[in-house]
Amino acid sequence: MNILTFDVEEWFHLLAFDNTRTEAQWGKYEVRIYENVDRILDILERTNTKATFFIIGWVAKTYPDVVKKIAAKYQIGSHTMNHQLVWQQTPEEFRKDVESSIKLLQDITGQPIECFRAPGFSIRESESWAYDILADLGIKYDCSVFPAHHAHGGMAGFGAPVPSLIKHGDVEMKEFPVTTKTILGKKIVFSGGGYFRLVPYRLLKSWSAECANGYANHMVPRIWHDKAGNVVMGDDGFPVTRNVGYLLSYIHPRDLDGGQPMLEGLPLKRKFKSYVGVKGAAEKLRYYLKDFKFVDVKTAADNICWEKVPVVTI
């Protein structure tokens, strides 16, 4: 079960960088969202691939035509309104931010917004209150868990990086964590962001194939259908399932933009992480989507037997 996601931001939406931290600063930068989104849509069309797009509310407010173009064929999710880290907000601020983004996206697209991803995977164990708010706002699927250490968040103790039910009090949230692979004792997220750009394609393909085939027994209970497409039910009253592997990839439009300007004032390490491999990443994605079949979050969720997935209590 391979899932493709995009975090739709402008090229300057880097987290924890003072020069681009607030909305008041964003208007002075070059607009690249049109060509960057068109590049993605062209690749998806040519490879017949479905994906989920997590869109910042600011992008939707500023460029509603871009959002409408995406929503014509693809699932839309919220990436908050103003791209701020969750752990830097109070619960009240977080609710207001997410609620405004959901309303805006629903008004523009006519779609129910049922999917969410936090900027920088910034829901940690200490921000578990966020799940109460997300559920209250109608979110059914979350893609915010980074099951390793991360500069902006992460849940290193999450458990196996597979679809799970997060339980927080009376709330249950269907969670799609980012895929990880352990290399020399360290968990790395190779299928998205900087690692996607950095890792040579042969290695990316090899690691992805391992995960898609059930790396380290990280499996998903996929619902079994008969030849007519009907769900096959077992004697226990639950759907019959077959365990399959799991791979989730996340890409930003700027990851594929080889012509973007370089932001001034970035530390050397951050500059490397932000721009390494951007010139060849679009071509790499084309190969990736030809070698692996991906679906969007909703399609994946509809094909999982959630009664049989791990339960993670936070």
Where are the language model's segments positioned?
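Metal-dependent polysaccharide deacetylase catalytic core of the NodB/CE4 family, i.e.
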Residues: 47-127, 139, 144-152, 171-183
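C-terminal domain-boundary segment and adjacent tail
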Residues: 46-48, 198-232, 243-314
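Generic structural signal for well-ordered alpha-helices
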Residues: 37-41, 64-68, 98-102, 131, ...
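Active-site beta->alpha N-cap acidic-glycine motif
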Residues: 1-75
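Short acidic/His/Gly/Ser-rich catalytic and metal-binding motifs that mark active-site loops
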Residues: 11-16, 184-186, 257-263
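Conserved, mostly hydrophobic/aromatic
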Residues: 7, 44, 79, 116, ...
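The substrate-binding groove and active-site-proximal loops of carbohydrate-active enzymes
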Residues: 24-31, 54-56, 82-94, 119-122, ...
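Active-site-adjacent pocket scaffolds in enzyme catalytic domains
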Residues: 111, 118-236, 240-244, 249, ...
